[in-house]
Amino acid sequence: MLENGSHFFEGVEKLLEIWFEESSNGDDDLRNISRSDWENVLSNVNCQIISTSKNDIIDAFVLSESSMFVSKRRWILKTCGTTTPLKCLGQLLKLAEANGYNVVADLFYSRKNFTRPEAQITPHQGFTEEVTYLDSIFPNGRSYCLGSMNLECWYLYTFSRSDIKITPQLISDEKNVDSDPDQTIEILMQDLDPETMSIFYKNKFNDANGATVKSGIDTILPTMHIDDFLFDPCGYSMNGINDKGEYMTIHITPENQFSYVSFETNVALSNYRKLINQVINTFKPGKFIVTIFANKCSLAYETMKELEVEYSQGSHWKRTDMQCCNFPSYNLLFAQYSHSEKTGDYL
């Protein structure tokens, strides 16, 4: 709530992803952690599990504030509102250790700048505070800000064991933490089309499936098995997982004054241009940010450079910012677009 009593909800999410090093026991698996243990972890975040879906490779959880994904040695938590995901790290690491994973290989914490930062709760009242909190657990972490700090920006904190200088006696113990191909694309959208957003109100559809089909969400990545939820009176979340263990997730805050939609997937593609166009055509934002992470084993590691080209020339999108970063194990592309009056393809 705002100080004057008017309604507000922070759609911008905090995204936390952790990869653990392979354990010596092949039977170790984060998916062995019980639901009750996950509920205890999430109680520190101030969110609850609404529904679950799973296959042989990945477990997906729709939460009261966004989503969680668990695979053998990877954990992803994405939460919106005034949630506090960093506060669950201590408990999470203890659970992981109890299930055979005692070394973090890579950690990523990221978020866009908040619409109402003053409404957030410690340790999320500012990126400096978040970095201080993370540094207390991961003393070799690194923090970044991409985009314009006084306008729209995207914050990132990373930790990687490959950043740590390995002494000779530890070389024989060093694992290949980059053995699994990994890529993630996020599309963060604002100022959405009101007619499209009206689909995600309970007075329009009684169940989430109606909104999923009407909006065309089900056609974005057709191989995904969808678990969706429509909030009362408005708002929408969905998780999709496929037989390869890949995921997608969409979260929608439809209120016109602060509309926000996030799309995320780790589907491996050699070119993300078509996918970006489909997502943007589905939700029709006024502006959006694209981020793509890809490690050296990923199909997208080299081909993500396609988006470094100014595809928006001649279209009704103007690229207002673009930055690339090279990390020890990953490449990152950040690009921001705003609407112009021209017509044509989105990218």
Swiss-Prot record:
PTM section of the record: Is synthesized initially as an inactive proenzyme. Formation of the active enzyme involves a self-maturation process in which the active site pyruvoyl group is generated from an internal serine residue via an autocatalytic post-translational modification. Two non-identical subunits are generated from the proenzyme in this reaction, and the pyruvate is formed at the N-terminus of the alpha chain, which is derived from the carboxyl end of the proenzyme.
Coiled coil regions in record: none
Catalysed reaction equations from the record: S-adenosyl-L-methionine + H(+) = S-adenosyl 3-(methylsulfanyl)propylamine + CO2
Effect of mutating Y346N: In strain: Berkeley
Outcome following mutation: T167S: In strain: Canton-S
Annotated InterPro entries: AdoMetDC-like, S-AdoMet_decarboxylase_euk, S-AdoMet_deCO2ase_core, S-AdoMet_deCO2ase_CS
Annotated phenotype, changing S172T: In strain: Canton-S
Family: Belongs to the eukaryotic AdoMetDC family.
Protein's name according to its UniProt entry: S-adenosylmethionine decarboxylase proenzyme
Organism this protein belongs to: Drosophila melanogaster (Fruit fly)
